[in-house]
C-alpha cells in the first residue's frame, strides 16, 4: 500500500496554483466593485441646477472679459446680422429685431438631458415667422452624460433639421463649465472624444454636420488646441471686441462671430461671415 508522505513534490505545486487562483479572483472582484478609482472616474456629475442662466457666451465675458479695441467694425456687404437667445431673454420682440436688420437667429433648446428652454416655441417659431433663418443650439455639460445621450436629447427636443431653406444646422455650445471645473473634470482626449460622440450622433439623426460654438482660449485650455473638427464643423466663435482674433486649431476661417453680449434688444449679436446667399446655402446643406 502506498503512503502519502508530507514531503510529496506535487502538493506544494497544487497549493501554489490554488493560492494564485484565489488571489487573481480577489483582484478581479475588487476591480469590479463600485467605489473603486475606475468606477469613481466614470460617475456622472449631478444634473445642472441653473440651466436658465447658461447660454451661449454666458461664461465668456466672465472668464475672458471684453477684448481691447472697442466696438466691432461696421458690417460689410459680405456679412449678415444675427442674434442668439435663450430663456433668460424671455419672449423676444422679433419684429423689432427684423426691422433693425437681423436676419438669422440661434435659439437655445436644451442643456444636458434634463432641461428644455420654456421659451423655445416663442423664440424658435417667432424668429421663423418674422422671416429669419434660425437654428437651435445645445449647451453641453460633458460630465453629466455621454455625447450620444445629449445629442439624442437635443434632436428630440427642438434640435432637428429640415431642408426648408429656413433651418440652420444645430450647434453645440462648448464653453467654461458654469458648475465647477473649467474643463468639466475631463482630459483633453476625453473632451474631444465626447464631442466626436455628440457630432456623430447628431449627424446620424439629422444628416447634417453641426456647428461648434467655442472660444479659442477655452479650446486651447481644455482640448489642447485640437484640430479634429475644423475640416467638418463650422465654427461659431465668441469674441467681444474689434476683430475675431486668433481661431482655434483646424479652422482657417470662422462661420459666425458673436461680437457682443450687450447689443440692442437681446444682448448677444452675431455676424455671419458671408452674404445672405451663403447663409441660405448653410441652411440648405
Regions found by a protein language model. Name each.
Residues 2-41:
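Secretory targeting and sorting signals
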Residues 42-89, 95, 228-285:
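Functionally critical loop-and-helix segments that line ligand-binding/catalytic clefts
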Residues 13-16, 116, 146-147, 222:
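Short Asp/Glu-rich motifs
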Residues 114, 143, 219, 244, ...:
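Flexible, glycine-rich phosphate/dinucleotide-binding loops
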Residues 6, 10-12, 89, 94-99, ...:
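Short alpha-helical interface patches
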Residues 75-205:
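Substrate-binding cleft of extracellular glycoside hydrolase catalytic domains
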Residues 166-250:
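Catalytic domains of cell-wall/extracellular-matrix polysaccharide-remodeling enzymes
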Residues 26, 130, 146-152, 272-275, ...:
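Ligand-binding grooves and catalytic loops that recognize ribose/phosphate and carbohydrate rings
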Amino acid at each position: 500500500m502506498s503512503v502519502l508522505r508530507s514531503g510529496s513534490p506535487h502538493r506544494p505545486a497544487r497549493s501554489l496554483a490554488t493560492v494564485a487562483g484565489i488571489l487573481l479572483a480577489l483582484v478581479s472582484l475588487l476591480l469590479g466593485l463600485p467605489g473603486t478609482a475606475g468606477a469613481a472616474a466614470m460617475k456622472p456629475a449631478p444634473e445642472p441646477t441653473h440651466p436658465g442662466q447658461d447660454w451661449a457666451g454666458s461664461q465668456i465675458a466672465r472668464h475672458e472679459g471684453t477684448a481691447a479695441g472697442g466696438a466691432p467694425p461696421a458690417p460689410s456687404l459680405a456679412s449678415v446680422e444675427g442674434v442668439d437667445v435663450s430663456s433668460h431673454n424671455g419672449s423676444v420682440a422679433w419684429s423689432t429685431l427684423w426691422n433693425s436688420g437681423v436676419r438669422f437667429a440661434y435659439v437655445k433648446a436644451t442643456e444636458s438631458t434634463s432641461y428644455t428652454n420654456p421659451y423655445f416655441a416663442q423664440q424658435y417659431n417667432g424668429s421663423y415667422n418674422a422671416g429669419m433663418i434660425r437654428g437651435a443650439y445645445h449647451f453641453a455639460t460633458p460630465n453629466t452624460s455621454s455625447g450620444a445621450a445629449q445629442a439624442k436629447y437635443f434632436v428630440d427636443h427642438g434640435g432637428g433639421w429640415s431642408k426648408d431653406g429656413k433651418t440652420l444646422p444645430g450647434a453645440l455650445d462648448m464653453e467654461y463649465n458654469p458648475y465647477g471645473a473649467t474643463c468639466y473634470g475631463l482630459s483633453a482626449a476625453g473632451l474631444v472624444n465626447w464631442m466626436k460622440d455628440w457630432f456623430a450622433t447628431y449627424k446620424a439623426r439629422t444628416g447634417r454636420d453641426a456647428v461648434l460654438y467655442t472660444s479659442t482660449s477655452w479650446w486651447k485650455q481644455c482640448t489642447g488646441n485640437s484640430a479634429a473638427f475644423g475640416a467638418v464643423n463650422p465654427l461659431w466663435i465668441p469674441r467681444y471686441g474689434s476683430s475675431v482674433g486668433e481661431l482655434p486649431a483646424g479652422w482657417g476661417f470662422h462661420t459666425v462671430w458673436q461680437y457682443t453680449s450687450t447689443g440692442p434688444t437681446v444682448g448677444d449679436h452675431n455676424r455671419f461671415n458671408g452674404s445672405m446667399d451663403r447663409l441660405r446655402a448653410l441652411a440648405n446643406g
